[in-house]
């Protein structure tokens, strides 16, 4: 007997990939940036390492822009993916929840992209 069902292709692997990348990025790079910018620099360590001019030139370079985009966009996708599945787990049914959460992540990613590249 043959099974002639046509299965709908899922878009979930794309979102799981962004979720995983955002979680990994947030676990590895975000604590390092918080440690350096939020703790070590205010304590006066490395006073010449992050002057305004150096920070601005890094942020305006292509590597710096990509770094800041990844710092913003990947954890954003991770967080909104978690919220989407948390609502499902708590049985709070948001109408068109995939469109709401992933659409919001896409819109905020575009806003971040515009903001970073107009810096």
From Swiss-Prot:
The keyword Lipid metabolism does not apply. One of its GO terms (biological process) is fumarate metabolic process. It is a multi-pass membrane protein. It is found in: Cell inner membrane. One of its GO terms (molecular function) is succinate dehydrogenase activity. The keyword Nucleotide-binding does not apply. GO terms for cellular component: fumarate reductase complex; plasma membrane. Keywords: Cell inner membrane, Cell membrane, Membrane, Transmembrane, Transmembrane helix. Gene3D superfamilies: Fumarate reductase/succinate dehydrogenase, transmembrane subunit (1.20.1300.10). InterPro entries: Fumarate_red_D (IPR003418), SQR/QFR_C/D (IPR034804). The chain crosses the membrane at residues 26-46, 61-81, 99-119. Part of an enzyme complex containing four subunits: a flavoprotein (FrdA), an iron-sulfur protein (FrdB), and two hydrophobic anchor proteins (FrdC and FrdD). Belongs to the FrdD family. HAMAP family: Fumarate_red_D (MF_00709). NCBIfam families: PRK05470.1-1. Two distinct, membrane-bound, FAD-containing enzymes are responsible for the catalysis of fumarate and succinate interconversion; fumarate reductase is used in anaerobic growth, and succinate dehydrogenase is used in aerobic growth. Anchors the catalytic components of the fumarate reductase complex to the cell inner membrane, binds quinones. This is Fumarate reductase subunit D. The lineage of its organism: Bacteria, Pseudomonadati, Pseudomonadota, Gammaproteobacteria, Enterobacterales. The gene is frdD.
């Amino acid at each position: 007997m043959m099974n002639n069902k046509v299965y709908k292709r899922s878009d979930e692997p794309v979102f799981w990939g962004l979720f995983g990348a955002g979680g990994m990025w947030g676990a590895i790079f975000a604590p390092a940036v918080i440690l350096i910018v939020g703790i070590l620099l205010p304590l006066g360590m490395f006073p010449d390492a992050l002057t305004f001019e150096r920070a601005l030139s890094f942020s305006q370079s292509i590597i710096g822009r990509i770094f800041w985009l990844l710092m913003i966009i990947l954890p954003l996708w991770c967080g909104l993916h978690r919220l989407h599945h948390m609502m499902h787990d708590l049985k709070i049914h948001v109408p068109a929840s995939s469109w709401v959460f992933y659409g919001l992540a896409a819109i905020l990613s575009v806003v971040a992209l515009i903001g970073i590249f107009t810096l």
